[in-house]
Structure formats: structure tokens, C-alpha cells
Design a protein with these regions (language model features):
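Glycine/proline-rich low-complexity spacer/linker segments in large multi-domain proteins
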Residues: 22, 55-84, 167-217
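Short beta-strands within extracellular/lumenal beta-sheet-rich domains
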Residues: 1, 36-38, 102-113, 147-150
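Aromatic-lined ligand-binding clefts that engage carbohydrates, nucleic acids, or primary amines
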Residues: 1-19, 50, 111-137, 143-144, ...
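A short, structured loop/turn motif at beta-sheet edges
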Residues: 40-47, 75-79, 116, 152-161, ...
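Short beta-strand segments within Ig-like beta-sandwich modules, predominantly Fibronectin type-III
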Residues: 26-30, 139-144
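Extracellular/lumenal ectodomain signal focusing on beta-strand-rich modules
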Residues: 14, 42, 70, 111, ...
């Protein structure tokens, strides 16, 4: 429950969910202000039917719509199923952890015990814009470019929480996920594949921190 539908021109559409009329009163927007959100009735367990009616002609461009809410998604071939949300993720692709279409930021936390030291963090295998690193809630820097290392000065003896905030991208949210050729360029025709260059299955890109960051500890007594 408490889900939203994000869609362009929402106020001009006729929308029903399981034969129940959806009030198209705008209550927000998603990513871009042209993609507006409306509240959906409760989504029931099992098969649900969402119908969107709009005036359609030769010059009409239809765009994707998005169901937003506190839930996870499982993709299998051509099908996607809403599942319980995954509140804990590991260092691997988010597409296999209930977040195949997620394009926002993700926070990873790990606890360590250190002596008085400095540390070097290496996170060289991720798919996103950059990683922000925090120690005990204090921002220490970002990892974005090779060699993907960050020095943390003056860590005191004791327990610390290291947080990695991955800034995501929208490749699995707005990208051409049915384009078999997967070209390296992006333009209008990237979303217009047809024939044997189009498939019903989702062709997803890995996102997230894909391998555990390495934390190197150097005791201050050895760094004279």
C-alpha cells in the first residue's frame, strides 16, 4: 500500500487499478518535474491490472510509467514481480537483490575495530557515479577516479562505523532495457529498437558496489 504511479501528463489520463478509478490529483514528481505522481489504491497479493487510457494519434509519444513504493522487485525473463523490500544489501549487483530498476543512492555500512592509525580504503569495482565515504558519520572524501583509493587520517583506537554511499545512476530506470544490440551511444533511436534487435526480456546493467572495499590499516607507530 501507499504506492504511487509516476507518469507524464497524469492529469490528462484515465487510470484504473483492478477496476478501481485512480484519482489523478498530482501529489509530487519523480526525477523530472514532467513525470508527475498520483496515489494508487492498495496493490493486492496476486495478479493486478493497471490500465492507462490516453488520447493516441500519429504524433503521440508514449513514455514509461513507474510504480513507486516501499517494496522490492524480482525479475525473471519477461516478468517482474513486486516482493517484500530488501532492507539489507551486500556488495554485489543490486539487480539481484530486489532492486533491479532502482536508480537512487545506496548506503552500505560496516563496523571495524582499529588501533591508533590511518587507513587507506580501496573500492575499485562499482557501478555508479561515485562513492562517498563517512567514518562515524563524518564525511571523509569521495572515490570516483582511478586508482579508487582514499586515505583516512587519524583514526583513534576503538570501534568505528565506515559508511559507503554509492551515488547511483538511472541506466536501469530510463535506459534501453530491451535493446539487444546494446550500443555504446545514446540517442533517440536507442529506445526504438525493433525486429530481432528488440526482446521482451529485461537486459539489465549491474549497479552498486560490486566487490567488498578493502580497508588497509597502518598503525601510527609504524608511520614515523
Amino acid at each position: 500500500k501507499d504506492a504511487f504511479l509516476a507518469i507524464e501528463d497524469a492529469e490528462k489520463l484515465q487510470i484504473t487499478l483492478n477496476n478501481e478509478t485512480v484519482c489523478n490529483e498530482i501529489n509530487g514528481w519523480y526525477v523530472d518535474k514532467s513525470i508527475k505522481t498520483v496515489s494508487l489504491p492498495e496493490i493486492k497479493k496476486g495478479l493486478n491490472e493497471l490500465i492507462v487510457k490516453l488520447p493516441f494519434g500519429k504524433r503521440t509519444n508514449t513514455e514509461w510509467c513507474y510504480i513507486l513504493g516501499d517494496f522490492g522487485v524480482k525479475t525473471e525473463g519477461c516478468f517482474s514481480t513486486i516482493i517484500e523490500p530488501n532492507t539489507h544489501v551486500g556488495f554485489s549487483s543490486l539487480t539481484n537483490q530486489g532492486l533491479p530498476f532502482y536508480g537512487g543512492n545506496v548506503s552500505y555500512k560496516t563496523n571495524i575495530h582499529t588501533p591508533d592509525c590511518y587507513a587507506i580504503i580501496c573500492a575499485n569495482y562499482f557501478r555508479g557515479a561515485l562513492i562517498k565515504v563517512l567514518v562515524d558519520g563524518e564525511e571523509k572524501g569521495i572515490i570516483a577516479f582511478a586508482p579508487y583509493r582514499l586515505k583516512i587520517d587519524e583514526m583513534t583506537k576503538g570501534n568505528h562505523t565506515i559508511e559507503f554511499i554509492l551515488y547511483g545512476n538511472r541506466i536501469n530506470t530510463f535506459g534501453g532495457m530491451h535493446n539487444i544490440s546494446q550500443p555504446k551511444w545514446v540517442g533517440p533511436n536507442f529506445w526504438r529498437s525493433e525486429g530481432d534487435q528488440w526482446c521482451y526480456e529485461y537486459i539489465l546493467k549491474d549497479t552498486g558496489i560490486l566487490a567488498s572495499p578493502i580497508i588497509e590499516i597502518y598503525e601510527n607507530s609504524t608511520n614515523k
